[in-house]
């Protein structure tokens, strides 16, 4: 099969001359890079996140995979085939003795050799015809893909194809990689696994850009390498691909929550004491971060009366802590002896006040009984303090919500202004009248009766004026209606005269006939 493949390559005289110059030159062709093979985005795909990977795949691979790059790749694979076939053993031996950089170039060289050797599995026709057919087919498929409108089903299909490209590639002819040392391949695996938190993808799972455009047919007349797809768990690969994005989203959500909590603390926010957050029976009280002050003191006490004294000292009153922003964690003593000490050791008593802004990082193991005692006693004390502070806040709010009548500050909302404005004006008027009555000197009874009569007369005059204005408005409307009726009457009179003239004319015409 390889003999027929090499004989087919020598049909073209230009290629024969090119191969002769390559074989006779002492330096030879340079090792082809991944960019020459069309895998430019493979080395960069691990450093970007999932959305950038997908967009770059759409722009560079789906649309930019044109005929010129495919023709160049196929020409390079054919022209370099004899050089790689003749010098593969020497290159493998040289690579095995060198460092990590040469190992990477050896991997690329082997990958190119596999690509070239797989071309010989099919009967080779004229190379020009093969290049023209491949370029035409790729142009047609690229035009068909770019011409379609980006709908929801189209987007899902592209993402499914992108996932398959990331997860599968046909490993053909990888037996030539056995010369690579085992520790060097493990080193390359570790380097690939460190890119942006992605899991390791072996050379078998590297994306094949040709395989994304062709269907896996088994016909011998196919012009492409029909790669066999390797099934990989799609769920795990998608999770590993989106791990970086999810971690960034989690960090952003955590930052937003902390900012919101800080904003609420500035107003006033009482929090429950931190006796939760990752307490397990099998593990110690982990994952708590002490930020500010830890005022605990630990003593060994033999007298049980000290327990009551310490509990009594924690029953303090927090009257001035209305603007308390830190989380208060009051812990009472744990009466259980330490497990690491002997049974005759005295119990360790720990009491105090921890001012924390986050969970403290103390590795403290609590039993079930001590946990219940600490939780109940501290919750009762903090609940009493909290109720007292909330009562103070309610009093402050009531004091602020008083309306302004004279000298009291007003805190009325805009919605109640319309309802309270009338009552306020009436109350201010009554207060002014009462003030005038208090300021005016004493008047005899007859004068007071006269003044009262005058006030009543003023009210009657005011009402009469209102009635007169109403009547005038009514009169104006009636006069307008009368004028309209008079105008209509004049129009009807004119119409009547015109009709009479018409009747007379008709009668005169009939009399003449």
From Swiss-Prot:
Disruption phenotype: No visible phenotype under normal growth conditions, but roots of mutant plants are impaired in the interaction with both rhizobia and the arbuscular mycorrhiza (AM) fungus Glomus intraradices. Stunted growth when grown in nitrogen-limiting conditions and in presence of Sinorhizobium meliloti. Highly expressed in roots. Expressed in root hairs and nodules. Not detected in leaves or flowers. GO terms for molecular function: protein homodimerization activity; sequence-specific DNA binding. It is found in: Nucleus. Keywords: Coiled coil, Nodulation, Nucleus. Its main location: nucleus. One of its GO terms (biological process) is nodulation. Belongs to the CYCLOPS family. Residues 359-380 have a biased composition (Polar residues). The gene is CYCLOPS. Forms homodimers. Interacts with CCAMK. InterPro entries: CYCLOPS. One of its GO terms (cellular component) is nucleus. A motif (Nuclear localization signal) lies at residues 397-400, 421-424. Residues 447-513 form a coiled coil. This is Protein CYCLOPS. Residues 329-380, 395-435 are annotated as: Disordered. Involved symbiotic signaling. Required for root infection by symbiotic rhizobia, infection thread (IT) formation, and nodule development. Required for proper induction of early nodulin gene expression. Probably not involved in nodule organogenesis. Involved in arbuscular mycorrhizal (AM) symbiosis. Required for fungal infection of the outer cortical cell layers, and for arbuscule development during the AM symbiosis. Acts downstream of CCAMK. Required for symbiosome formation (i.e. the release of the bacteria from the ITs) and subsequent symbiosome development. Residues 333-347 have a biased composition (Low complexity). It comes from the Eukaryota.
